[in-house]
Every structure is written in structure tokens, then in C-alpha cells.
Amino acid sequence: MITMKHVILVGDGMADYPLDELDGKTPLQVADKPNMDQLAGMGACGLLRTVPEGMEAGSDVANLSIMGYDPRRYYTGRGPLEAASIGVELGDDDVAFRCNLINADERIVDFNAGHIETAEASSLIDALNHELETRGRFYAGVSYRNLFVIEGRGYTSVRVEPPHDIVGESVAAHLPSGSEEADHIRELMLESAGVLRSHEVNLKRESMGKRPATMIWLWGQGLRPSMEPFSERYGIRGATITAVDLIKGLGVYAGLENIHVPGATGYLDTDYRAKGRYAAGALEEYDFLYVHVEAPDEAGHAGDAEEKIRAIENIDRFVLGRLLDALSDHEHRIAVLPDHPTPIEIRTHVPDPVPCILAGDGVDADQVKSYDEFTVREGSLGTWEAHRLMEIMMDPAARLRQ
């Protein structure tokens, strides 16, 4: 039996708003992306709502939705997803927090400690475990993205804003308060500064002109989610290709294997060629691939339009181009979309619907001939909830017509 191949390619934060510096166009409109444009001309286009009304426009919510799980039912928080990605098993009452290493004085300077190296971050996490008296434990992740786990369901109600949403704002104004659990988290965040500022890793970074990690920021907490495995839903094997712990963790709970790609960093310097090569090769073993590229989101957070354009072009050439070549030997369906916009001008996520292409066997072309935030509005898909995308992707009998 011939098995259809299914691919979802996510350019994280790829969508944007028109920019004066681009003569009123978006990075997607300006980028040279022949593969995306050709695919748009061959398939059906529209807008997907990846973030349900009233929920935060996080990559956790948005990618959960794209994978086919309605966040209103399945989402518990970002922390447990990242715990799964690094093999940390949570008990029923364990609450997992995302633990950013950040640079701050009285204000938050950045949310990533100058994109600290993973080995440096690991040393700092060891020091936090050794020096801070806490009922929980810190776990090293990748670069500034780390984890803190503590027992007690009351910690789920602590409100802390994501640090990437409050860069430039007062630290004190955004520390949690109002409950015993919130006070404990606030104390940990403040006490971390005393541990980190004099650490040899930070002293060395400062001597090299790099930003030190001056404190931790705990946020995005939640309990372990309960999700129906992908194989039980659709009866096929799937895998993720991503350098971001959050997406790996989503895959773990969904029963998707993660394919490690050497040189994939989750940043602007990621090896696009390697991601494309490994994705193409994985089609020989897996019938579903979720390929995620973080770079456009990082460019959006940095407010760098040229870097976002470059990231889009690299995804198009080295990832999508390679995938389309490999898929030509198979019956297939492929979707290309961002998880959410990360507009250059505001440097954070917004919940706006995202432009989507769905192409392949059983999908009739509409009149859209290029791919961006505006052309897709004329497409045959219209606007719909992103968690329904998988229903169409995985139903071999489904046929999308104009």
C-alpha cells in the first residue's frame, strides 16, 4: 500500500506587519521565496487562527494548535512541554516553570543573557542548585532556555509575564506577588542575582564584552498535560525536526520522535541546509514530519527586518526546496505557515491569524499566485481554526476544492 507523506513546515514568527523601511511591505512580501510562491500557486491558501481568543500568543499555544490539539482543551503551560523535551518526568503535583537566564539591572535589558552558550548556562544552573535553598530543582536546557520544577499545584496560579514581552521595563513592576507561592517565586528570582553576578562564567563574559546572565526569570508554568498520542489518532509514525525544546516537548506528549540535526541551533545561525537534508531523509522512515525553524521569530524579537528576510529566504531555499524535491517521489500533502506573527516594530508575538498554504494530492489550486499575509486572503481556505488543519492533512479521502 502506498502511504501518503504529510509535512508541516513552520517558520516561527514569520508573519509581520508592513514596515516603512520596506516601503510599506512585510518581510514575507519582500523576501525572494520562489518555492513558497510556487507552492501557493499549486495549492489552497487562507488564514489560520492558531491562538484561540483570550489565550496568550505563545509558540506553545500556537504549535499545539497546528499539531491538531485544541489548546482550550489540552494546554496547561509551557514549562511541562520543555520538561518533556529534556527528559524530566513530572509527578502529578509537580509544576514546571520555564527558567530564562536574562540580563537586567533595574530594568530588563534582554530575555536571553546575550544568547549565552549552553555550556555556560549549564554551569550557572549548577550554581543555582547548589546555592539557593528551595523546594524545587533547576535543570539545564539549551542556551538561555532552562527549567525549574517545584511540587505544589498552587504554583500554577502565580502570574509572571514572559520576559520577551517586557524588555526595557522595570524588573520590580513585573515580579509576582499576592500569595505564598508568588512570594516564593519572587524571592528565588531576586536571590538568583546574588548567585549569578559574581560567577566566573559571567565575569569571563563581561571581560569579553558580552552581556552576563544577571538573574533568572521564571514563567510559563504548568502541570503535566494529557494528550492522545499521534499514532493512536492517525495510525502512522511521525517526527519533529526542531532545535527548540518547547516543540520537542510537544512532540514527546504527542508521541512524535525528535530527529536531532547537527548544527540546528534555534537561532539565526542555524544550519538550514542540514535541516533540509535531514527532513528529506526522514521521509523514508516517517509518514508525518513537523519541521520547525525558529530563526524568523528571533529576528522579530530583535527588531531586525533584514535578518527576518534572510531567514525566510533560507527556509525557502534550503528547507522547503529540499523537502519539495523529496516529496515529488511520494503522494503527499504539505502545509507551510508561521505559528504566529512576531512583528519587527513591536518585537513580540501577536495573536493575529497567520497565512497558510496547503498543497499536494487532493488539493485543488485557487487563484493565489504568491505567498504573504495579504495574498492568502483571496484563497479558497478562508479563515479557520488551526487545530482543524490536521483533520484535512491526515484524511486520505479529504479533497479540498475551490
UniProtKB/Swiss-Prot annotation:
Q: Write out the entry's keywords from A to Z.
A: Glycolysis, Isomerase
EC number(s) on record? 5.4.2.12
Keyword Isomerase in annotation = yes
Pfam families assigned: Metalloenzyme, PhosphMutase
Name the lineage: Archaea, Methanobacteriati, Methanobacteriota, Methanomada group, Methanobacteria
Supply the name of the protein: 2,3-bisphosphoglycerate-independent phosphoglycerate mutase 2
Query: Any signal peptide, and if so, which residues?
Result: none
Is-annotated flag, keyword tRNA processing?
Answer: no
Family matches, as NCBIfam families: apgM, hyp_Hser_kinase, PRK04200.1
User: What is the reaction catalyzed?
Assistant: (2R)-2-phosphoglycerate = (2R)-3-phosphoglycerate
Q: Which GO terms describe its molecular function?
A: metal ion binding; phosphoglycerate mutase activity
What functional role does this protein have? Catalyzes the interconversion of 2-phosphoglycerate and 3-phosphoglycerate.
Q: Give the record's pathway.
A: Carbohydrate degradation; glycolysis; pyruvate from D-glyceraldehyde 3-phosphate: step 3/5
- Source organism of the structure: Methanothermobacter thermautotrophicus (strain ATCC 29096 / DSM 1053 / JCM 10044 / NBRC 100330 / Delta H)
> Which cysteine pairs are joined by S-S bonds?
none
GO annotation terms (biological process): glycolytic process
Q: Which family does it belong to?
A: Belongs to the BPG-independent phosphoglycerate mutase family. A-PGAM subfamily.
